[in-house]
Regions:
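Bacterial N-terminal signal peptides
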Residues: 6-17
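Positively charged n-region of N-terminal signal peptides that target proteins for export
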Residues: 1-5
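Acidic, contiguous N-terminal accessory segments
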Residues: 21-116, 150-156
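Short helix/loop capping segments that flank catalytic or ligand/cofactor-binding pockets
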Residues: 95, 133-136, 180-181, 413, ...
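Feature activates predominantly on carbohydrate-active enzymes
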Residues: 56-59, 63, 103-284, 427
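Catalytic domains of carbohydrate-active enzymes that cleave complex glycans
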Residues: 489-690
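Catalytic-core regions of glycoside hydrolase
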Residues: 72, 147-149, 173, 204-206, ...
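Conserved, mostly hydrophobic/aromatic
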Residues: 64, 129, 198, 308, ...
Length: 690
């Protein structure tokens, strides 16, 4: 929840149906190049608006207070001077503002318009329905500018928008890394802040995975408290932010032990004898699936939909579709028994690799994924199988049910089966792969491919992106959801996208932050160093100026993005300094110093984020440094330097070169991270360079 939101006393004036005649017939604003002052604005919202519209209005007020340092003084809207902000058609009408017909707007569509009125300006926001008004307020927040302690929007304002995609969802999936990077380490306040960040990007679907698969039943008091927290987060997203929440779960993986770890946030997974896949054809095992579901739905009973992925985690080798349907029917019965009166959540199938397909082993033997799935999949047989799945659901499942298309080829069969309106497209990895070493991703091509493919299917319900480490992936995430709102944004050049993002994060530091993002792939160590010194000064001073619509919501503190950029740029600078030096004639000692410095920066970040745990549990048994043609050339040059004039470089010389730095680095970092992540693959690359 935003830092000062929720304090009603100084925030708003509730519209009470003031006659339009008392509003002195507002006229549309026409003068360009002027400002509409918001520092002392009165915000008006009708008390009959839904809770999420009321909350959005409070959030707007809190943001203005944050910029100006001034509480929104309560004043009657009919007599107040200065700018008045009307939230919703009823509030606008109370100020004499009429929008005309809004029926042409699509779902979540809105109008933001400024009017001139005797005594001050009126800035009105309204949607075709409350959800549109809610998204309109999120958009207004993006338009707000600060000049010192003065808040304003550029005038005139006349925006009429509808989204390209009605459903714009985000899914988090990742690993047990350190706080605040990995979502599994988040607590309730962090989850709510994430929901706020999503709302600020006009995301309207939150696809949440609570990891019921690691909670054995009967639930411990700690596990039950954790699920109660999930329930409250769902409630917050839906009631206070107007989002839909979908809950993810495996169809047949259950927790059988807590692995000796009481806190589910740090409980290991996937670990044999801690979690198991159940065979739905075995009555006893099917009963255990139902017991797990029942305990889950009894607490987390307030979501809009429940999604079962067809595999990974879960699935059963060669299990027929009838077994998947039996699981869905059991889930339907149990969900309906626990859901609030008058509601019927949707059941959704995440079409991943297909129920009963591609597993090598008997699932009772191991919960570690092992699939005969290659870069040639999904092939024609996989797509055909998804068609069979859809037809089976049509014939055997009660409504409402839906689909997530998890692979681009599945969209064709979804269209053929005429269920595009039931389907959200989740091109997993378009924003960020997982598992993947923690790094901010740049580049737009993967996102453009998503919307190129999705654009071929008129009637598709929506699109979804995924994050492994949300706090690192603002560039691509921002680009993805700006494009989901309006696909014309796909044509915006990356430097301009980063400027747009930086304005939403740190408006007073817009150019610095955008340049820092771009520097993550800069080849010039000196140029990176110049930016680093400015970031260090910003971080050390602790004040980046008034936060933007996104920046105000960052956690664990307002400078999180600055700090993450600084640490990643230190890695990049060290890498490029080594590469640049290898193009000259450095001494062996200089080369050793540069390599050790590069590894030290990498390993510091590796430890900061908690990726060292991934190496320790062998999920990531490979290098953590960034490969590339420039590094390959540098390694060959290093091999020549280590020869010290000899016609060739034997292994002994290379091994000896790394010896002292191994000792130094192992004194600071764990052995696996040093040796598996850095030394051994780097050494081998030098040996094999030619």
């Amino acid at each position: 929840m935003p830092r000062t939101v929720g304090v009603w006393a100084f925030v708003l004036v509730l519209a009470c149906g003031a006659p339009a005649s008392e509003a002195q017939a507002p006229q549309r604003s026409e003068e360009h190049g002027s400002r509409i002052a918001l520092s002392t604005a009165t915000i008006t919202v009708d008390p009959t608006e839904p809770s999420y519209v009321q909350y959005a209005a409070r959030d707007l007020s809190a943001y203005l207070e944050q910029i100006t340092g001034l509480p929104r003084a309560a004043a009657k809207p009919r007599s107040a001077g200065g700018t008045r902000v009307a939230i919703g058609t009823a509030a606008a009408r109370s100020l004499g503002v009429e929008f005309g017909a809004l029926d042409d707007l699509r779902d979540d569509g809105f109008v933001i318009r400024s009017f001139e009125q005797r005594g001050g300006a009126v800035l009105a926001v309204a949607g075709r329905d409350p959800h549109g008004t809610n998204i309109g307020v999120a958009t207004l927040l993006q338009l707000i500018r600060a000049d010192g302690r003065l808040a304003y929007v550029d005038a005139p304002v006349d925006r009429r928008e509808s989204p390209t995609y009605a459903v714009r969802g985000i899914h988090l999936n990742g690993w047990p890394l350190n706080y605040p990077y990995a979502f599994r380490a988040w607590k309730e306040a962090d989850w709510k802040r994430f929901v706020d960040i999503a709302w600020a990007q006009r995301i309207n679907l939150f696809y949440l995975w609570p990891f019921m698969e690691i909670l054995p039943v009967p639930l411990s008091s700690g596990d039950e408290a954790y699920l109660q927290e999930v329930h409250r987060v769902v409630e917050y997203a839906q009631r206070q932010r107007g989002m839909d929440v979908w809950i993810m779960q495996s169809a047949n993986r259950i927790g059988v032990s807590d692995c000796g770890v009481r806190d589910p946030r740090v409980r290991p997974y996937w670990v044999n004898d801690c979690q198991k896949d159940m065979n739905p054809a075995d009555p006893a095992q099917f009963a255990r699936i139902e017991q797990s579901f029942d305990a889950f739905y009894a607490i987390v009973n307030n979501a809009k939909a429940y999604v079962m992925i067809d595999s990974d985690p879960g699935g059963w080798p060669q299990s027929p579709l009838d077994d998947q349907v039996r699981i869905f029917k059991a889930a339907r019965r149990l969900i309906d028994g626990h859901a609030a009166a008058g509601t019927r959540p949707t059941l959704i199938d995440w079409m991943h690799v297909g129920w009963g397909r591609h597993k090598f082993f008997t699932s009772t033997d191991s919960v570690v994924g092992a699939y005969d799935w290659t870069d040639k999949n999904p092939d024609e047989s996989d797509v055909a199988f998804m068609g069979e799945t859809i037809r089976t659901f049509k014939a055997q499942l009660d409504e409402p049910w839906g689909l997530i298309a998890g692979q681009p080829p599945y969209l064709s069969i979804v269209a053929k089966e005429q269920v595009l309106g039931k389907t959200v497209y989740l091109p997993y990895g378009a924003i960020e792969s997982e598992p993947a070493f923690p790094a901010t991703n740049l580049g737009q091509d993967s996102v453009r491919r998503v919307f190129t493919r999705a654009g071929e299917f008129t009637g598709l319900r929506g699109v979804m992106g995924n994050n492994q480490l949300m706090l690192l992936q603002f560039p691509r995430t921002f680009y993805f959801f700006m494009s989901a709102w309006n696909t014309q944004y796909l044509d915006r050049a990356e430097p301009d996208v980063l400027l747009d993002l930086a304005r939403q994060l740190y408006p007073a530091q817009q150019r610095l932050i955008a340049d820092a993002f771009l520097a993550l792939r800069d080849d010039d160590a000196e140029r990176i160093g110049s930016l680093l010194s400015r970031l260090e000064a910003l971080e050390g001073g602790g004040d980046a100026g008034p936060a933007g619509a996104l920046g105000r919501l960052l956690f664990p503190d307002a400078l999180a993005v600055v700090r993450n950029l600084r640490m990643q740029l230190e890695i990049r600078q060290a890498r490029q300094a080594f590469v640049a030096a290898m193009r000259g004639r450095p001494t062996k000692a200089d080369a050793a110093r540069l390599v050790e410095r590069y590894f030290d920066r990498l390993l510091e970040w590796n430890k900061e984020t908690g990726w060292d745990k991934m190496i320790a549990i062998t999920v990531w048994p490979r290098p953590i440094y960034e490969a590339g043609k420039d590094l390959t050339e540098a390694l060959y040059r290093l091999k020549q330097i280590l020869a010290e004039g000899a016609p060739y470089t034997g292994y002994g010389r290379i091994d000896a070169f790394f010896g002292p730095m191994v000792t130094a680095l192992r004194a600071k970092y764990d052995e696996d991270s040093v040796m598996v992540g850095c030394i051994e693959p780097f050494k081998l690359a030098v040996v094999q360079s030619q």
